[in-house]
Amino acid sequence: MAEIAAPTTPMMRQYLETKARYPDAILFFRLGDFYEMFFEDAIAASEALQITLTARAKGDEKVPMCGVPHHAARGYVARLLEKGFKVAICDQVEEPGRSAIVRREVTRVVTPGMVFDDQVLDPREASFLGSIAPGERGGGLALLDASTGLLQCGEVPDDARLVEELRRVGVRELLLPRGADPDRTDAIARAVGAPVARRDDAEFTRAEERLRRHLGVAGLEGFGVAGLPLGLAAAAAALAYLEETQRASPRHVDRIARLALEGVLLLDEATRANLELERSLSGGRRQGTLLALLDRSVTAPGGRRVAEWLRYPLLDPRAIGARLDAVEELCASSVAREDLAAALRPVGDAERLLSRIVLGQGNARDLRALAGALLALPALSDLLAGRQAEALRQAGGRMRGLEDLAGLLDRAVAEDPPASLREGGIVRRGHSRELDEIVAVAEDGKGTIARLEAKERERTGIGSLKVRYNRVFGYYIEVTKPNLHLVPKEYERRQTTVGGERFVTPELREFEERVLTAEERRFALEERIFEELRATVAEAAPRIRSAADAGATADALLSLARVAAERGWARPAVDSSEALEIEDGRHPVVEAMLPRDSGGFVPNDVAVASRGDPAFERHGCLHVITGPNMAGKSTVLRQAALTALLAQMGSFVPAGSARVGLVDRVFTRVGASDDLARGRSTFMVEMTETAAILHNATRRSLVVLDEIGRGTSTFDGVSIAWAVAEHLHDRVGCRTLFATHYHELQDLAREREGVRNLTVAVREVGDQVVFLRKLVAGGASRSYGIEVAKLAGLPAEVLARAREILRNLEALEMDEGGHAALARGRRHGAASPDQLGLFGAPPDPVAAGLREEIAGLDLDGLRPLDALNLIAAWKKRLG
């Protein structure tokens, strides 16, 4: 930043002094109808926004500058936020002309985690700021959604869990103490992938005292956060950041909650991605995800609540049952759903309206919208109070007690107020007699003059008397010379003209004062009334937030009921067992996206139970699922995991029936991709995810594995897959669904009592393969990879060659060198007996010995794993 030089203009000096206080932000400096940027800010902003960079003369130098219209600033701020910038908004806080230079102040700082503008925020996504107070291992974590006032904190045991929780909610910005180990905090920040704001260590100290003072309580025990010193430190820092950036007391943050780190079903990042809960694997979009299917909410807070429940499925059967009761009641009646939707609609996004108003960023339109929301609450409350489900009745009970405030706002705020206070007309007529009189003067000046003129003519008998105005004398009464003898004594002479004289009266002076200052007085009084209303809303913020929260819950339950009714889903039985029994289960998203003429989704049954559960003997704990490519193995795996997740979030499930024993964690190892940015190959990613499963799965977990070991050689892959399956069966004993193309793994069922073999059925019709999509008992002997390649459009020549090589491999046909005869049959000309083939070599004694051993094998008694071991030994002998 350029130094403040003596010859700078007062305005430029003001700019530089302000910029010095916000060195890490782009400074939007209000000049008239524009926000201007100078120096490095102008260069950075012009590049980011693709706007013209100009220059302003400063002595012999030219200062880079650019600007945006103040009425369009919101869009430009949003674009800068997307590119990772912070923006400090410096506004004029007094009218021009009252002093040599207009006083300006930074009214707020907009950062990625401190956004309140509804044109920038996604209405259906939370906007979390993450704050970390590092400990020796792990540390305190706070999550603050400043746009709604939600503040949560907790403590986690290690940095990996910190990252996992921050990525779970998709934090927009991260707070870290400056004094923390930079290597460690940099690693956390990189893993989270959010912009970082480093704050003074002091903001993480005296946390409990500061939080108690802000919340106005003697202790924090009632919030359930006592005994979390690091968590409270992170929360206090987040609250301080909110107050500093918004230049206002965040009274809408009226409570603090314990972060849901226990008592919820845990989903790591890989699982959330593999199951496509909130972002699709193709393009990272919301479309095609489970959340997109589930969110049938009427209001934005309802949509955010559905997303929250999806991120944090429950582990308490009673709490799950309470949600299911509400969903079942609403699902049973289309009239009940329609009535509730109609009652919820006018409530809108009261949470974010409240936040903007309390922080001084709301306008009269926000007050009007809040009035509409509050006016709708009594009818919504009555509707919910009449339901049977306790969750619905409880929500309705939290919406009472705001009728007086709703009435006040409705009476005070105009029906369609302007966005700006300076436009006037934000207060409804009849609310303030004083304001009504001022408005009448301002809007009926000519009528008042005409009435005054008529009154004076009648009183004085001067028929030619006129009331006039000019800029020099203001308002005056003009009397011609022939009528001067009729002028009353109280008239004060102001000027003599050729044709007569000009006078003023006390009444005319008073009128002039009223007219000339009416607009200013109107603006001032409307602003005062607006601030009084805002303060009244702020006082009621806890009650408003509670009512809005209840509305979000009711809307989320309605959303789940709508999906269940429209999709034909069933209520699951959720208990404390360790069984998972699904009859006629479907994949919710795949089914929803099928074309109408597709014939419908083919349902499947899944029944698996952890070791130790009474159902273990019937179902087994590990299902080895084989079958062709494209037959639907991965879909079956995912739909089983999604069924458990849906049940524990309190939703109906896409099945004929389902019994879900509580699952503490869902793990998935599905698909394969490189992580080039972190230098990890496909196989390394696969093994890292598998290691996390083996280290963290418990007997109550649900593990879904798809194609373990395929990123390396066949022998290595089979060995790893076999060992992983044994570990999960023998050591963990959890419910496991293991899809594989390694048919050798089917032999596990001979050795392990809890292993069951399943396959996805196909039917061969001539040289065509029909995928039946049905999961049946038994194993597969072929993967039909070449048939799938044909469907994909591989050239006929390539397919023919592939079939030839496959026949050689399946027959284990060896060439003269003892190698699988992959190249046999592909001759491009005669070759002499001594010529080396593509894979061949001259005959040797070792190869001859191997042929004899192979010829003597008892194939009927040979297990697949024994065969692999023999092949490995032969390979070693061949060098």
Model features per residue range: what roles?
Residues 2-329, 338, 345-358, 362-454, ...:
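Charged catalytic and DNA/RNA-contacting regions of genome-maintenance
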Residues 24, 50-51, 82-86, 92, ...:
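Non-catalytic alpha-helical coupling and interface elements of nucleotide-dependent molecular machines
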Residues 88-90, 112-121, 249, 385-391, ...:
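Active-site phosphate-binding and catalytic loops of NTP-dependent enzymes
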Residues 359, 363, 373-376, 390, ...:
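Charged, surface-exposed helical/loop "interaction arms" that form contiguous linear patches used
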Residues 497-535:
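Extended, charged coiled-coil "arm/hinge" scaffolds of SMC/Rad50-like chromosome-maintenance ATPases
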